[in-house]
From Swiss-Prot:
It comes from Oryza sativa subsp. japonica. One of its GO terms (molecular function) is hydroxycinnamoyltransferase activity. Residues 220-247, 260-313, 331-400 are annotated as: Disordered. The active site is at H169. This is Acyl transferase 8. Residues 224-234 have a biased composition (Low complexity). Involved in the incorporation of ferulate into the cell wall. May act as arabinoxylan feruloyl transferase.
Length: 431
């Protein structure tokens, strides 16, 4: 009840109003707007309220700190300090960077933020009293729709304050039309000043630091002003004769790929292997070879010339995460080439899509023969073939000829006389 009574008796008094200009000189000129922002409906002002807690014994008044920070921010955001104007014969809306500044109002409230429930809905204070609505003398005319930003700082009795914004929707930097986020109390005032002195070594030649530049053949900037060429880079990929595989290796060694990499220190570092699972040991001991030699390995099979299986391990020193299945689909084959089968010979599913052997307890899927396509019926090779087929399909049946009719009549009477003679011979009479 006490808070409601204090909120009902709360009054907001506007102490002063003035124009805050940028603290330094800003560039001028007119900035065009987009075709959407030039519509007359976009000249509305977006309103927002921002509530901040504070202390009653603050050394600096919030309005004074925000005013100084606003003047410093307008130097970088100088279009906000301008005015909206119409230029040209068509009256297109532009931002005139005049550098006049934004409208700033300072006000006080006779209650605390707790009395008005920190401006929660429903509002206990009229929002128009917390939003900036400037009053002009009769001799001056400043239409509000030409202003880009209006700010009002209302300080409450508890030390907290409310910042009210009215921002032009046409010049809003955000899609929703909201003003830029407000910094903390005196945030811009406490920032470090920019460096005024000269930067040491700014006029010297640029220094390019590349890790392992002598091994990669990168040109390095010289201190004498020239460019010192680097050492030529060795060949990236080289084929060597396959040595004899160790006795403990599970398969035979097909070939070796020597890949020079800056981070490959002989086997442990560098890139990984495609298709190798985490924690899988090196069966062939290729990583222990000098120079980071890594082998391509596959198990022995009865048939040669098959595609490389999915568990094939290739060197991936660049870290590209290659897909082993793509190597198989690409047509990489090992061993003697296998001649193609005849077209009439059936091919099974396991020949087209080989799979790794399953576990003993798993059930092997059945292999169905590949269905052959049905042969299409060929049309007669004539220029009027479609018309002939259509006429044959819709042609009515031919009428019965006289010869066919005579044959039918003769056979009918032959069977009738045969039955009559049979009845007369055996003396069969009807009852």
């Amino acid at each position: 009840m006490r808070g409601s009574a204090a909120a009902a008796a709360a009054t907001v008094t506007r102490v002063a109003q003035r124009v805050v200009a940028p603290s330094a000189a800003t560039p001028g000129g007119a900035l065009p707007l987009s075709w959407l922002d030039r519509y007359p409906t976009q000249r509305a002002l977006i309103e927002s309220l921002h509530v901040f807690k504070g202390r009653a014994d603050a050394a600096v008044a919030p309005a004074a700190a925000i005013e100084r920070a606003l003047a410093a921010a307008l130097v970088s955001y100088y279009p906000i300090a301008g005015r909206l104007a119409e230029r040209g014969d068509g009256g297109e809306l532009v931002v005139d960077c005049t550098g006049e500044g934004v409208w700033f109002i300072e006000a006080t409230a006779s209650c605390s933020l707790e009395d008005v429930d920190y401006l929660e809905y429903p509002l206990m204070v009229d929002k128009d009293e917390l939003l900036p609505h400037p009053t002009y003398p009769a001799s001056e005319s400043h239409p509000e729709d030409s202003l880009i930003l209006l700010v009002q700082v209302t300080q409450f009795a508890c030390g907290g304050f409310v910042v009210g914004f009215r921002f032009s929707h046409a010049a809003a930097p955000r899609p929703d039309g909201a003003p830029p986020p407000v910094p903390r109390h005196g945030h811009l005032h406490r920032l470090h000043r920019p460096l005024q002195g000269e930067v040491p070594g700014a006029d010297g030649p640029p220094v390019q630091r590349v890790r392992g530049a002598h091994r990669q053949g990168v040109a390095v900037a010289d201190a004498r002003g020239g460019v010192r060429p680097g050492v030529p880079r060795p060949r990236v990929l080289r084929h060597e004769r396959a040595p004899r595989a160790p006795a403990r290796a599970p398969g035979r060694l097909l070939r070796q790929l020597l890949l020079h990499h800056a981070g490959d220190g002989g086997g442990g570092g560098g890139g990984g292997r495609v298709g190798e699972r985490r924690g899988e040991a090196d069966p062939g001991g290729e990583e222990a070879a000098p120079g980071g030699v890594r082998a391509v390995e596959r198990r022995r099979r009865r048939r040669r010339g098959r595609p490389v299986p999915d568990h094939l391990r290739l060197p991936d020193a660049a870290g590209l995460r290659l897909v082993a299945a793509g190597v198989r689909r690409g047509g990489l084959r090992v061993g003697r080439p296998r001649p193609r089968r005849a077209a009439h010979q059936p091919r099974l599913h396991r020949h087209l899509h080989p799979r790794p052997p399953l576990r003993p307890q798993a059930r092997r899927p059945p292999h169905h023969p590949v269905r052959r396509r049905r042969r299409r019926r060929r049309l007669p090779q004539r220029h009027d073939a479609p018309r002939l087929i259509t006429e044959r399909a819709h042609r009515p049946p031919p009428p019965t000829s006289p010869a066919q009719f005579d044959s039918f009549f003769f056979s009918f009477f032959f069977w009738v006389f045969s039955l009559l003679s049979l009845y007369a011979r055996h003396g069969i009479h009807s009852p």
